């Protein structure tokens, strides 16, 4: 087995989201938090239904949760929370304060940041633009654009209306874009 390069100390682990999730499991089930990834991993393998349902609840996912599961012998074919529905944009934009949401740094070092509030406002403007132009659920929006803040906003707005987003960055080069 390869040598471990780094491991967080106990204090850092105590402040982690993973440990918060373990404490959440402890409140709901007979699970004792140990700040031990392997123990948690083994619990998830033994309790996949409880795990996936707990991830949904712990993450405060907004949507319609269906507790239907399919666990065949071939783990790669497993399905969890089958037919559950959520909107990525609705969940992402539930934060609307002035804390940093997105940071863009170009190859040349140009840096730009926006807050959750700005991300929400800009995304709402794009949603209105899409609606005014009769773009609707299952329509496709394709972009040839750099991975910058406006691209993120466009993706979120597309998701919010149920359209399908596809983008390709110019740094793929002409052949990469064509393929």
Where are these regions (language model features)?
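A short N-terminal helical cap/helix-turn-helix that marks the beginning
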Residues: 53-66, 82-103
